[in-house]
Amino acid sequence: MRLFIAEKPSLGREIAKGLGGGTNKGKYIEIGNGQDIVTWEFGHLLENYAPDDYDEKYKTNRLEDLPIIPSEWKMKLRGPDVKEQFDTIRRLVEKADSIVHAGDPDREGQLLVDELLEYLHNTKPVQRILLNALDEKSVKEALNDLRDNKDFVGLMNSARARSYADWLVGMNLSRAFSVPARNAGYPKALRIGRVKTPTMALVVRREEEIQKFKAVTYYQVQIDWRYQDAKIIRSLWQPDENIGGLDLEERLIDRSVAEGLLSKIQEANVSASISKIEKTTKKELQRLPYSLSALQVEAGKRFSYDPKTVLQCMQQLYEKKLTTYPRSDCDYLPENQFNDASEIIRGLTGVHEDLDMIAQNADLSIHSRAWNDKKISAHHAIIPTREKCDLGALDEKEQNLYLMVARAYLAQFYPEHIYQSTKLWIECANENFTATGKVILQDGWRSLYRKESSEDDTDGENSSLPNISKGEPVAYQAGSVLEKQTKPPTRFTPATLLQAMKEIHKHVKDKSLKNRLKSVSGIGTEATRATIIDSLIEADFLRLEKKFLVPTEQSYMMMKFLPDTITWPDTTALWEDELEDIKEGRKTVKEFIDGKLSTIQSCVNEAKWLKVDPPKNAVVCPDCGKVLVRRTGKNGYFWGCTGYPDCKKTYPDKKGKPDTEDHTVTCPACRTGRLRRLKGKYGYFWGCSDPDCRKNFRDKNGKPELPAMANH
């Protein structure tokens, strides 16, 4: 029996259809007489051990126990809800003669099935199916092109190394820096992540740049020249670098200089002429089809869709067999798929009026740069499938995204965009002016995007310039002084933050790393970036104001004391570079992890000596002067001193604040806590606020019934 293990039930059902259909047995599908069986996971069925799974002492967070470095990495079932499916797969693996790995064609999809087979001590031969599309023809083609799963060991190892690195950073550094933060009065445990924290820091630093920004007013002199009594050439003055009134950025900041120049030109009884001409013919190759991140960024700009919404919609389109695998980090296509183009384009006719004419005019003889086997890894760019799309059956977001994907695919079958760029230099009264213009010679693929394009609305640029020669005269027509201001950096939106994660080389602290990291595909993956941004919002590190991301007080607090190793993306970007080395077999998982231990230890050591400033609204303990924090005890909320165990003072909680007024009764049992009236299952009673004291007293007419010698 051949056993297929899919990443999720929907994928399993499509594989079963590709095999000819079968009988659904609930947790698997049996094909024919049982020669093939298709079962599935629900994402990861396994997860790494938590620290206290390795040793119960880690249930309490103590700096002296850190760092936690497993000598042997272990896994466990993700939870009781997956046990039945796990048991089904275990039984089927035991019966199977061979296994087909049907995880998603990416790093995590590879690990997801491999780790399960390893956990089950599988020794059966394993093949790999790569499904980039779920339409019937694509599934059957993939079934006829199974590969040896050993070819993907590097991909699995890189995913495993990523998992271990995330665990080491998250478990150790979250615990380490939570201790000094808690001692300073911050009630929440910190959550530090290898990718989350530098992503949060990008937003904090951008906000700090905006707050520090001071606008600079500067001036430009715009002159319109008349050529042959009809045509107007619009130009800008180019001040000499030695002229007064320029700042360090060579912006003119003295208005009187601009006004003086304008008067000089207006009053000059001298001719102006063309002193220099530059003409350049330029080509723009066809835009590439979409990777997931490119689609998320563009959909964010065009429709204000957040990255998570785009991923969810693309997953739906994939499962409806209308587009290919959504979590792709690739924007190229395999050369053998060029032969499918006529069938795909034929399927795009009749879908939408905007696509009809584009599809009909597509030139199948054009072979764009998108078709390149050398750029392909496990998956390719997102494109439409052969399946006919009923656009009316999709919601508005799915429609818009489908049309974006279809248009980008069709652009591959249109000519290059060709234009002529012209720059003129005009001399008048020993002053220089420049004018630029652009003439489209062949619109090509850009004609598909003309409605959305605003590139020709460039400030100060002429849509076209007259056919003029060097030395020809022009006459002054009109002039003005333009007042402009420098603009602050723009706040991140979810889409532009995702783009920054993808292009992380632009945001590193060590600029010498910039070129090296250009080849790294950013921090996070296509599948996780949207989730990371979402989780930062849910955990109150970031919040959305209108469509922009702004940091919260918690983020600013963390940035004050976390080391650069954690907050700058340099370290984690270099780790991504190493994960690529593991994938290609140039480095082992052990070598990678061993190289990270010194970084983890260094950060833990820093946390041990760290002093954190208390929060703005901190309440000071009246007894010792340290900070009170709100805690949960067996009888509800109370406030305890961060000086514990030296100071054991506690206070009852009153509407979220410590009630420090001494009007409560001291507990006669422990003499440190205070008695509070609480409502239990059988009515009111009095309990001690000290979490270590479990003494209770009956309620009598709203007061505690105490022993005769109790102190009040």
For each of these PLM feature ranges, what is it?
Residues 1-171, 488:
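Intrinsically disordered, low-complexity regulatory segments
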Residues 2-3, 82, 119, 174, ...:
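Basic, low-complexity terminal or inter-domain segments flanking catalytic cores
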Residues 138-223, 280:
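C-terminal or mid-to-C-terminal helical accessory/interaction module adjacent to the motor/catalytic core
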Residues 27-55, 197-241, 354, 412-463, ...:
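Structured, non-catalytic alpha/beta "coupling" segments that mediate domain-domain communication
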Residues 51, 95-100, 140, 234-239, ...:
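OB-fold/S1-family RNA-binding modules
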Residues 245-288, 296:
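Metal- or metallocofactor-binding catalytic centers and their adjacent structured scaffolds
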